[in-house]
A protein has these predicted regions:
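Glycan-recognition and catalytic cores of secretory/periplasmic carbohydrate-active enzymes
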Residues: 1-189
Length: 189
C-alpha cells in the first residue's frame, strides 16, 4: 500500500465531463490503432461509446463529481460535442451528429451574443450556464476552449446540418470577442 495517504483522498468518480474527455481520447485512439492493433482499437471504440453514454445520461440526470461540483454547461457540452464528433469520425453514425448538435444549441445559449449594457460592451464570450450568471473562466487548469472547439468540430463534419450557420455565427462572435479583447489589452494583446 502507498505510504502517502493522500492517494486515498481522491476517489474515482463518474462525472459527465470526465467521461466525455475519456470518450474523445479513446475515439482518437481507435483511429490511431485500427490498422496496427485491431483488438486494442476495438476495445478503445467500445470504451469510447460506453463512456460517451455514461456522460450523456449523467449530464441529462444532473450527475456531477463531488470534487468539481455542479456541471458547467458550456464546458460539458463543449466536450460532449467533441466526443460526439470523434465518435462520428469512427462510426459514421449520424446519432453522434444529432447529439453533438444538441450540445451545440446549449453552447450557443451560453454565449453572450448581444452587446451588454457595459461601458465597454463585449460579446462573443461564454458563460458557464444558459442563464448567463457566471462567465466561463478558470484560474488554474482551463477549459475555455471547450465550447469553441466543439463548435469548430461540428462545423467540420456537419456542413449540411440545419444549425450550421448558427455554429458559424457563434464562432464569428467569439472571434470578435478575441479581437476586441486584444485591442483593450494593448500592449499585451
Amino acid at each position: 500500500s502507498p505510504d502517502n495517504k493522500t492517494v486515498y483522498s481522491n476517489v474515482a468518480e463518474n462525472g459527465p465531463f470526465e467521461n466525455f474527455c475519456a470518450s474523445a481520447a479513446l475515439a482518437k485512439a481507435y483511429l490511431v490503432y485500427k490498422e496496427e492493433d485491431n483488438v486494442f482499437a476495438n476495445w478503445c471504440l467500445r470504451s469510447a461509446k460506453e463512456d460517451f453514454e455514461f456522460a450523456k445520461v449523467g449530464y441529462e440526470q444532473g450527475i456531477y463529481t463531488k470534487r468539481w461540483g455542479p456541471n458547467i454547461d458550456s464546458q460539458v457540452c463543449g466536450h460532449g460535442a467533441i466526443a460526439a464528433v470523434e465518435l462520428f469520425k469512427c462510426t459514421n453514425d449520424s446519432y453522434y451528429i444529432d447529439v453533438a448538435a444538441t450540445y451545440g444549441k446549449t453552447i450557443l445559449a451560453c454565449q453572450q451574443s448581444t452587446d451588454p449594457d457595459w461601458d465597454i460592451p463585449l460579446k462573443g464570450f461564454f458563460y458557464e450556464d444558459k442563464e448567463h450568471k457566471w462567465m466561463l473562466t478558470y484560474e488554474h487548469r482551463g477549459h475555455e476552449q471547450s465550447p469553441v472547439q466543439g463548435l469548430c468540430m461540428l462545423c467540420e463534419v456537419a456542413q449540411n446540418h440545419p444549425d450550421y450557420q448558427l455554429w458559424i455565427k457563434g464562432l464569428e462572435l467569439y472571434r470578435e470577442y478575441v479581437l476586441k479583447s486584444m485591442e483593450l489589452t494593448v500592449p499585451y494583446g
